[in-house]
Design a protein with these regions (language model features):
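Non-catalytic interaction-recognition regions
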Residues: 87, 100-105, 111, 115-141, ...
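Structural preference for alpha-helix termini/caps and helix-kink/transition segments
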Residues: 288-291, 295-471
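N-terminal, positively charged nucleic-acid-binding surface of large information/translation enzymes
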Residues: 8, 17-118, 470
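Anion (oxyanion) recognition and catalysis
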Residues: 54, 147, 455
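Alpha-helical recognition segments enriched in aromatics with Gly/Pro capping
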Residues: 1-32, 47, 109, 115-116, ...
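Conserved beta-strand edge residues that scaffold enzyme active sites
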Residues: 67-68, 132, 160, 468
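Short, well-structured beta-strand/strand-turn elements
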Residues: 59-61, 150-156, 460-462
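Short glycine/proline-rich turn/loop motifs
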Residues: 27, 94-95, 211-217, 363-364, ...
Length: 471
């Protein structure tokens, strides 16, 4: 398996630090609103890497954080739909005020919606979903270590800051150099007098007296964590000081992942993350999704249009994860047609005698995925197999079922299901109606005779509380 490593600026062979066991940390949602389809495409990346690892016979441990505190409205790098709005207010607190609810109630509401969206897209759940609000002791421990090592200091306002100049490798992920950064470049417009250097960032922020929610007492007073602190603390707690892959959206390269890397490496004295893998932006109708443009699309919007959410998953798979994608309703509708055709074919092929998969097609499929998750090429392998008249239907069924372990499209959904009434032959439909009338009249002899006639024609009738089911 080779993936594009943002820090290495090239494809890297992925070799787990523990043989045949891959560890992945994925930046998760800030739970103050519903995740849009662009966020979901990023979350899909981790699922694809994990599924491919499984196809190689590896096990995985996946950790995805839940940010329910500390992500300020002016923090950069989220790629959200309201970036930069609302000054320095905590996003969760701001939404809680808008909805007239408690902060944690808001966080749990949108966390639940996030898990529902993951399920709709058949994204396998992570092994751990640590919440920032429940990881405060680990953050305090991390900050203590950074202060002790000289990588952090207490500012003039009582907040604790990371000393960016104490980490010489800063900028290795994004290419930004500290000496080139100036106030206003994703930092305060003017240098902050409470910090030693304008590029330093808050590990722990002193809370104003007016803030009564999402605050904790620490050795540095009452306050709340910085956004970047959270990921370092949670990843180190659950995965230790050697993490194979860290995923996230391309927007997170700087400053979030640069800051996280500086914190984790400084605290442990080692290079914690081996590979940084990022998903590219998603546009909708050629534009970045935003409230002002009115083009923010959620998973539930797809469902409400009568489309299968797995058609959205297929639409994502039709593009490379690190290729900017322009999603439209036409693209999703086209994917829906492909999905319906494949499910119909798989159900048809399931009735054929089983046959081994074609080794050549299997090798082509894995080769495409192993080369930086080239999902468009992998889908082309399926299309070629579908049309290949030299391959038996039983073999096609086995291949599509095997490939779906990675694709996650539920291609066998209609196998064994009753055909639609319109597709049932007229003579079979007439017999079903005759049998239903016989059962209503308690003429069980006729009912049994008709059942036997249908069986001779290759149909099995099952009686349920809702009526007859034909297979």
């Amino acid at each position: 398996m080779r993936l594009y490593d943002t820090r290495a600026r090239g494809l890297q062979t992925i070799t787990p630090s523990t043989p045949r066991h891959l560890t992945i940390y994925a930046c998760g949602p800030t739970v103050y609103r519903d995740a849009h389809v662009g966020n979901m495409r990023t979350f899909l990346l981790t699922d694809l890497i994990s599924r491919l690892a499984g196809m190689h016979g590896w096990t995985t441990t996946v950790v995805q954080n839940i940010t329910d505190v500390g992500h300020m409205a002016d923090d950069t790098g989220l790629g959200g739909v309201d970036e930069g709005q609302g000054g320095g207010e905590d996003r969760v607190l701001r939404q809680a005020a808008t909805e007239g609810s408690g902060a944690l109630a808001i966080a749990r509401k949108y966390e639940e919606a996030f898990h529902s969206d993951l399920s709709a897209l058949n994204i396998h759940p992570a092994d751990h979903y640590p919440r920032a609000s429940e990881s405060i002791p680990e953050m305090i421990e991390l900050i203590d270590a950074l202060l002790e090592r000289g990588n952090a200091y207490v500012g003039t306002d009582g907040s604790v800051f990371f000393d960016a100049r104490s980490f010489p490798e800063y900028g290795a992920i994004s290419g930004n150099r500290l000496e080139d950064l100036r106030p206003g470049h994703k930092f305060d417009v003017e240098a902050d007098p409470v910090k030693r250097f304008h590029a330093d960032w808050a590990l722990w922020k002193k809370a104003p007296d007016t803030r009564t929610q999402l605050v904790w007492d620490t050795p540095w007073g009452v306050g709340y964590p910085g956004w970047h602190t959270e990921c370092s603390a949670m990843s180190l707690k659950l995965l230790g000081s050697s993490i194979d892959i860290h995923t996230g959206g391309i927007d997170l390269r700087f400053p979030h992942h640069e800051d996280e890397r500086a914190q984790s490496n400084s605290a442990t004295g080692s290079d914690v993350v081996r590979h940084w893998v990022h998903a590219e932006h998603l546009l909708f109708d050629g534009r970045k999704m935003s409230k002002s443009a009115g083009n923010v699309v959620l998973v539930r919007d797809v469902i409400e249009r009568g489309l299968d959410p797995l058609a959205l998953r297929l639409a994502f798979l039709q593009h490379r994860y690190r290729q900017q994608m322009n999603l439209t309703w036409q693209v999703i509708e086209g994917a829906q047609k492909t999905l319906e055709r494949w499910r119909s074919k798989v159900a048809e092929w399931a009735n054929s005698p089983s046959a081994p998969m074609c080794a050549d097609y299997r090798e082509q499929f894995l080769a495409a995925l192993d080369e930086d998750l080239d999902t468009p090429r992998a889908l082309t392998v399926l299309r070629n197999l579908e049309k290949d008249a030299t391959i038996s239907e039983g073999s096609k069924f086995e291949f599509f079922a095997w490939a779906d372990a990675f694709l996650g499209l539920d291609l066998a959904r209609t196998v064994g299901q009753t055909p639609l009434a319109a597709e049932i032959p007229d003579d079979v439909q007439a017999l079903l109606e005759e049998r239903a009338a016989a059962r209503a009249a308690k003429d069980f002899a006729t009912s049994d005779r008709v059942r036997d006639e249908l069986a001779a024609m290759g149909y099995v009738v099952t009686d349920t509380p809702d009526g007859q089911v034909l297979n």
